[in-house]
Amino acid sequence: ATSYTLNEVVALKDVVPEWVRVGFSATTGAEFAAHEVLSWSFQSELSGTSGSN
């Protein structure tokens, strides 16, 4: 079986709104294939002043 790795760092604050949902999609055209997400990582940091809402 062939295996591919995709690794990308994206500054999401530059491309998405404050609230967002993330999903995955894959296709092979007319053929059947199984796609697996073997690892997923997300890191978030809250910026702002202390005590703000």
Swiss-Prot record:
Keywords from the named record: Lectin
Subunit structure: Tetramer of two alpha and two beta chains.
Name of the molecule in the record: Lectin alpha chain
Top-rank taxon: Eukaryota
InterPro entries tied to this protein: ConA-like_dom_sf (IPR013320), Lectin_LegA_CS (IPR000985), Legume_lectin_dom (IPR001220)
Organism of this sequence: Lathyrus aphaca
MF annotations from Gene Ontology: carbohydrate binding
Family of this protein: Belongs to the leguminous lectin family.
Keyword Phosphoprotein attributed: no
